[in-house]
Amino acid sequence: MQGRLSAWLVKHELVHRSLGFDYQGIETLQIKPEDWHSIAVISYVYGYNYLRSQCAYDVAPGGLLASVYHLTRIQYGVDQPEEVCIKVFAKRRNPRIPSVFWIWKSADFQERESYDMLGISYDNHPRLKRILMPESWIGWPLRKDYIAPNFYEIQDAH
């Protein structure tokens, strides 16, 4: 079984892999980083006009990093919008994924957070810098191989 976007991508010979459907019937597609920008543009033109969320996670210690996009197709007069989940996996060493900021402006802070916490560089993002951690922070705190710095917090004794 294929979702509508997946069937459209197959029809137009665009490389992707279906990872199945979640409990709500939303299909998850895997896209290669080098194909992501063109498929993101195609998705927008196809009608996925809203980026509901973007997040990232560390798949396994020493393994791949994943950037996840939840896209929604919002149409006037449609009560149940169509949704799709896109996963883009990047190599741990120098992870690079094209930014979708220029397609969906809501990707701005979300891609910055993924950069700040996991070190994924989003190519062509206009302000890719740390958003939660200080600029001087070393490392990527949400990576599974991250070693926390050895410091102690002074606490009030009450």
UniProtKB/Swiss-Prot annotation:
It catalyses: a plastoquinone + NADH + (n+1) H(+)(in) = a plastoquinol + NAD(+) + n H(+)(out); a plastoquinone + NADPH + (n+1) H(+)(in) = a plastoquinol + NADP(+) + n H(+)(out). Its main location: plastid. The keyword Membrane applies. It comes from the Eukaryota. It is a peripheral membrane protein. GO terms for cellular component: chloroplast thylakoid membrane. It is found in: Plastid, Chloroplast thylakoid membrane. It holds the Pfam family Complex1_30kDa. The keyword Mitochondrion does not apply. Its EC number is 7.1.1.-. Keywords: Chloroplast, Membrane, NAD, NADP, Plastid, Plastoquinone, Quinone, Thylakoid, Translocase, Transport. GO terms for biological process: photosynthesis, light reaction. GO terms for molecular function: NADH dehydrogenase (ubiquinone) activity; quinone binding. NDH shuttles electrons from NAD(P)H:plastoquinone, via FMN and iron-sulfur (Fe-S) centers, to quinones in the photosynthetic chain and possibly in a chloroplast respiratory chain. The immediate electron acceptor for the enzyme in this species is believed to be plastoquinone. Couples the redox reaction to proton translocation, and thus conserves the redox energy in a proton gradient. HAMAP family: NDH1_NuoC. Belongs to the complex I 30 kDa subunit family. PANTHER family: NADH DEHYDROGENASE [UBIQUINONE] IRON-SULFUR PROTEIN 3, MITOCHONDRIAL, NADH DEHYDROGENASE UBIQUINONE IRON-SULFUR PROTEIN 3. NDH is composed of at least 16 different subunits, 5 of which are encoded in the nucleus. This is NAD(P)H-quinone oxidoreductase subunit J, chloroplastic. It comes from Illicium oligandrum (Star anise). The lineage of its organism: Eukaryota, Viridiplantae, Streptophyta, Embryophyta, Tracheophyta.
